[in-house]
């Protein structure tokens, strides 16, 4: 962030800026989670969650909650991803996160997510590397989603959700072939669609 954070022009105008980022878009199983964070103007140690160890993410998630003016999470379940597609489900989770914020933001920054909004919006690629609010949102989203996947691992043992968090790995592929898709797998994704059905179909 050598050139200054993305939200700096909004901060200079005195606007409340919400950063949004998601976790789980490319996973084969589990929800998409979007974090929304409003930070006061300043400098922060927050980085893209993908660059952090799980322990560092947990520690920084607590820091985000301490310093944020507001934060919220929105979730789109696997069934909604199947019904709507990845982009629309991500936008739905983002809408839920924004509606859950206790403060109404006056400008938005996202990581290449084209939110339909009347508010001023910056949505460049790799915004989580250039914006502390987006990085903070990515940390909250990732930590929350990891906890969901840990719980799903207990509900649906054998898939390795606690290890791969629902993403495509050889272990996950082999579990799908052996067990078939679980109720929290995304049936639209080819590796899931091609696996033999063992669980009853949801109504």
Swiss-Prot record:
One of its GO terms (biological process) is mismatch repair. A divalent metal cation binds at residues 21-22, 111. It catalyses: Endonucleolytic cleavage to 5'-phosphomonoester. InterPro entries: RNase_HII (IPR022898), RNase_HII/HIII (IPR001352), RNase_HII/HIII_dom (IPR024567), RNaseH-like_sf (IPR012337), RNaseH_sf (IPR036397). It is found in: Cytoplasm. Its EC number is 3.1.26.4. Signal peptide: none annotated. Its cofactor is Mn(2+); Mg(2+). One of its GO terms (cellular component) is cytoplasm. HAMAP family: RNase_HII_B (MF_00052_B). Belongs to the RNase HII family. This is Ribonuclease HII.
